[in-house]
């Protein structure tokens, strides 16, 4: 059987950092429950697994939450623009070649980043390598069936290389004990066309396509958000 064609999401954090920031602001403004960073920070703190490596840390949302709780955290990102907002210690590096020795970290977080890789397994292998045998790995991704209210209007594209459908099995190739927390609920309330356009911008929809979608959608609009948070302990081999 031929494997389904998938594509990595193009990274634009240096060429268009405001797109990323707009997406974060839209989530903060319109989500009913916020994002995963708070519960992830709370669990990592509760389990006392340090130091923590925040892979693809962006502008440090998870990292800053953990440091506010007194945790030792290192941020790693391959975007100089994103990393400029992150306090030390931080590392400018590719997540497929993590510049730390084997078993160095008590926890590794890779939130909303594995779908940027043509082969996410390279990052999963590196995460396993730098994690202690009793350590904890956590990642997350949206579903390919996210935002069903707009499914017929958004530009079509192949599934991402890592999503909530294929992600758990891929993580299980490297880690033995997997927990999957899925979400599937009406979680994002967009009150008007301006909010919809802002969310579309953050979602990576081009200006022309965003205006086309907005012209066909009545607001207020509630979007169903689907995805998964994946926790992994230990090693599978």
What are the residue ranges of the model-derived segments?
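Conserved class I S-adenosyl-L-methionine
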Residues: 1-47, 61, 136-162
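Conserved Class I S-adenosyl-L-methionine
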Residues: 33, 59-61, 159-162, 172-237
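Class I SAM-dependent methyltransferase SAM/SAH-binding core
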Residues: 51-97
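A conserved beta-strand element that flanks and buttresses the S-adenosyl-L-methionine
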Residues: 109
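Short catalytic micro-motifs in class I SAM-dependent methyltransferases
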Residues: 112-116
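A short glycine-rich, Lys/Arg-flanked "PGG" loop and its adjoining helix->strand segment in the class I
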Residues: 121-133
């Amino acid at each position: 059987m031929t494997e389904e064609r998938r594509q990595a999401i193009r990274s634009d954090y240096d060429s268009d950092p405001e797109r990323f920031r707009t997406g974060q602001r839209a989530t903060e403004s319109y989500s009913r429950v916020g994002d995963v960073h708070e519960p992830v920070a709370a669990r990592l703190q509760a389990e006392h697994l340090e130091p923590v490596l925040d892979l693809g840390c962006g502008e440090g949302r998870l990292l800053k939450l953990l440091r506010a709780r007194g945790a030792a955290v290192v941020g790693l990102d391959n975007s100089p623009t994103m990393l400029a907002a992150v306090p030390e210690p931080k590392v400018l590096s590719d997540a497929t070649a993590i510049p730390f020795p084997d078993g160095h970290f008590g926890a590794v977080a890779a939130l909303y980043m594995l779908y940027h890789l043509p082969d996410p397994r390279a990052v999963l292998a590196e995460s396993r390598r730098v994690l202690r045998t009793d350590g904890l790995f956590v990642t997350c991704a949206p579903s390919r069936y996210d935002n069903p209210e707009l499914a017929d209007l958004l530009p079509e594209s192949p599934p991402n290389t890592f999503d909530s459908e294929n992600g758990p099995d891929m993580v299980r190739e490297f880690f033995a004990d997997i927990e999957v927390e899925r979400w599937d609920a009406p979680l994002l309330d967009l009150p008007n066309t301006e909010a919809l356009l802002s969310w579309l911008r953050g979602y990576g929809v081009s200006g022309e396509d965003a205006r086309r979608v907005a012209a066909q959608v009545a607001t207020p609009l509630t979007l169903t958000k689907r995805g998964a948070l994946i926790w992994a302990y230990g090693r599978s081999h």
